[in-house]
């Protein structure tokens, strides 16, 4: 006969089991809450984000420098040698040469986070040149490289993207090569027999009706890729806004230069070696052609959630070599932090030839909006974000000094 086994559980043991059961339930609930919280970041939910796409005029190229000088580069070094290091530890670039600076317009603050996916040198389509990958506004995916539209799609799935500012098209028109030709013509032809880049076939073919039509279609396709990326990520058109911006004038008209076109002072001192005639043509024909193509492409995309931001005159009064501003040494300054520096110095980086390149400067920074200009554009984007109800308009300087966020005063209207 087997002994009877007592299967009853005493009070202390019951309390232990109840405690274990309660802990199990609590952990299960926490896991569920954690899962819910993780899923809360995405289309229409969570912290709002601004994600910028495009080329050097939005990535933050030249953002390291605040003004220009022919003295020590330390006078204008606002961000230091880590200016373009955009990995998590700020020790290297995620894509070499993209130059995504910390002063870029993506980071508007005020409870809105920013992500900068733009890349200097980018065109509408991805490509590799001299072993450097340049992601376009497409879904390229090969060899570990991705297009910006694909990057956006992946990012937007797990973040609440509310505004997508875009700057694209300038490189499609080979504007950097155009500028190079203009500077070479200034340096290598005499004032009494000048070669004008604006009269060279290799330059003007970029602005021909046929090429304008081709590039306008490419820009439209890039914009539609952005909309497709957001749709693929689970967004409706009412949950985000695309903000297409055009390009600013970086130089004044010929009569607005503070250096004569006679001799070499204009380039050797000012870093703005263009003939008056070419400067006039750049502002009257070349840049308006690009800007019109960008905005017409935006219109043809027929997206109900698209706004435009006109920055063509955003830097007027602070442009490279423009009268009314100067190099730091010309304005009696020895630091970009000096009193009134933002009002007295240029917002466009000098054009540096190889022979004039020294210190930490890089050629790809030439003729780009610098630290002050990028903070100004950030102010413009903040106003375009409009506390979550995005709007478009034209952005221009509204006064001297800085706002509470340390940005130049600008008005979007």
State what each model feature region is.
Residues 56-60, 119-125, 170-175, 248-252, ...:
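Solvent-exposed loop/turn segments at secondary-structure junctions
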Residues 2-23, 47, 362:
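N-terminal export and membrane-targeting signals
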Residues 105-114, 215-242, 278-310:
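A structural motif corresponding to the C-terminal end of an alpha-helix
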Residues 73-210:
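Conserved SGNH/GDSL esterase-like catalytic core that processes O-acyl groups on lipids
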Residues 249-368:
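Mobile gating loops/cap/lid regions near enzyme active sites that modulate substrate access
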Residues 48-65, 74-76, 171-173, 371:
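Catalytic nucleophile-elbow at a beta strand-turn-alpha helix junction centered on a G-D-S/GDSL motif
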Residues 43-44, 60-66, 126-129, 175-180, ...:
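Short, solvent-exposed loop/turn and secondary-structure capping segments
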Residues 27-45:
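C-terminal region of N-terminal signal peptides and the immediate post-cleavage residues
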């Amino acid at each position: 006969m087997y002994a009877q086994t007592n299967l009853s559980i005493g009070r202390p043991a019951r309390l232990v089991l109840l405690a274990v059961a309660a802990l199990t339930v609590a952990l299960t609930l926490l896991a569920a809450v954690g899962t819910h919280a993780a899923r809360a970041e995405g289309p229409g939910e969570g912290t709002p984000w601004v994600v910028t796409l495009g080329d050097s005029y939005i990535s933050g190229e030249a953002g390291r420098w605040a003004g220009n000088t022919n003295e020590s580069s330390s006078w204008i070094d606002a961000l230091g040698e880590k200016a373009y290091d955009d990995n998590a530890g700020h020790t290297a670039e995620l894509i070499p040469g993209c130059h995504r600076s910390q002063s870029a317009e993506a980071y508007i603050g005020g409870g809105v986070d920013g992500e900068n996916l733009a890349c200097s040198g980018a065109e509408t389509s991805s490509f590799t040149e001299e072993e450097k990958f340049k992601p376009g506004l497409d879904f390229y995916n090969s060899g570990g490289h991705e297009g910006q539209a694909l990057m956006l799609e992946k990012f937007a799935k797990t973040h609440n993207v509310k505004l997508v500012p875009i700057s694209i098209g300038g490189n499609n028109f080979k504007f950097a090569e155009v500028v190079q030709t203009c500077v070479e013509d200034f340096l290598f032809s005499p004032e009494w027999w000048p070669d004008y880049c604006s009269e060279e076939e290799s330059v003007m073919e970029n602005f021909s009706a046929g090429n304008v039509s081709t590039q306008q279609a490419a820009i439209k396709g890039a914009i539609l890729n952005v909309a497709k990326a957001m749709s693929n990520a689970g967004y409706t058109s009412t949950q985000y806004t695309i903000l297409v911006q055009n390009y600013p004038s970086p130089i004044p008209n010929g009569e607005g230069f503070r250096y004569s076109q006679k001799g070499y002072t204009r380039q050797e001192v000012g870093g703005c070696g263009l003939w008056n005639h070419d400067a006039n043509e750049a502002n009257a024909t070349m840049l308006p052609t690009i800007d019109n193509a960008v905005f017409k492409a935006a219109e043809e995309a027929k997206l109900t959630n698209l706004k435009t931001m006109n920055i063509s005159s955003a830097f007027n009064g602070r442009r490279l070599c423009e009268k009314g501003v100067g190099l730091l040494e010309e304005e009696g300054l020895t630091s970009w932090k000096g009193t009134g520096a933002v009002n007295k110095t240029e917002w466009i980086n000098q054009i540096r030839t190889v022979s004039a390149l020294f210190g930490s400067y890089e050629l790809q920074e030439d003729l780009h909006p610098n630290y002050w200009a990028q903070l100004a554009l950030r102010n413009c984007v903040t106003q375009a974000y409009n506390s979550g109800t995005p709007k478009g308009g034209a952005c221009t300087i509204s006064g001297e000094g800085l706002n509470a966020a340390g940005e130049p005063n600008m008005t979007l209207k």
